[in-house]
């Protein structure tokens, strides 16, 4: 059966059919037959959301709305099933006629979250997101920003900024070279004779030495604390807690 829609429509609408028979006419509402212009739906999402700050430059998705719901979009025309694994919950994505898969999550708590795309059973990183070491592997991440109360971990104008340095050292315990990340306060280069206290800051489970400076913004936290007088200038050393036992991922040791 074919019909022509003469009036332009936007959004989702019910389709009604009138069947003429010997005993009169009947009106049926096939409420599962819905149509929409997919480009209009995408545009509607963009109007009420903003790009996640953890996106690669130029990527429009993932996006976040005012309720902290995340919107994911992924192009995979040959895939048969895709899910987003975020915050311990798997969301089934829906495929459109152009091969784009989309989904909206439940509201997320503010802060940083790891997530994965599960494409036909294979867990992969989202090419639209920067990757971070977490969950014992390289993973995609999405940052749900706080409001004004989150300024303590954001870089501020007029605040002297320190540095995070990647340092290589030889471990006598492991008999191998290792890497650690070291924060130095803004005054460090101009006070070469000053001795500073040292804070050794460990990451969470499944992360590594980059966690606090990359996902945790510790350098901005330290800069702001020092500038406000709430903290004395100090060095912060961040090393990997993976000393003896290897990380395990999905029940198997990493190879």
Where are these regions (language model features)?
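Alpha-glucan (starch/glycogen) binding determinants
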Residues: 16-18, 74, 80-143
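N-terminal cap/lid segment of alpha/beta-hydrolase-fold proteins
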Residues: 63-77, 90, 94-97, 105-106, ...
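Short, solvent-exposed loop/turn and secondary-structure capping segments
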Residues: 27-29, 85-87, 114-118, 127-129, ...
């Amino acid at each position: 059966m074919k019909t022509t829609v003469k009036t332009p429509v936007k959004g989702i609408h019910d389709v009604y059919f009138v069947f003429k028979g010997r005993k009169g006419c009947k009106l049926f509402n096939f409420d599962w037959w819905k149509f929409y212009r997919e480009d209009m739906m995408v545009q509607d999402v963009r109007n009420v959301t903003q790009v996640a700050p953890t996106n690669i430059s130029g990527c429009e998705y993932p996006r976040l709305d005012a309720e902290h719901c995340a919107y994911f979009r992924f192009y995979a025309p040959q895939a048969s099933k895709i899910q987003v694994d975020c915050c311990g919950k798997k969301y089934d994505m829906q495929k459109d006629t152009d091969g784009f898969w989309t989904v909206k999550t439940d509201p997320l708590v503010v802060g940083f979250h790891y997530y994965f795309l599960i494409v036909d059973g294979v867990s992969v990183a989202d090419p639209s997101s920067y990757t971070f070491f977490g969950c014992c592997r390289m993973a995609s991440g999405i940052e749900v920003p706080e409001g004004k109360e989150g300024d303590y971990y954001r870089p501020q104008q007029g605040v002297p900024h320190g540095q995070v340095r990647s340092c290589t050292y030889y471990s006598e315990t492991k008999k191998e070279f290792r890497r650690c990340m070291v924060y130095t306060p803004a005054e460090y280069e101009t006070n070469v004779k000053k001795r500073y206290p040292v804070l050794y800051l460990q990451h969470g489970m499944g992360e590594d030495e980059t966690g606090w400076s990359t996902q945790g913004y510790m350098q901005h936290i330290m800069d702001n604390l020092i500038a406000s007088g709430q903290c004395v200038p100090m060095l912060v050393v961040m090393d990997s807690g993976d000393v003896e036992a290897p990380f395990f991922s999905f029940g198997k040791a990493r190879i």
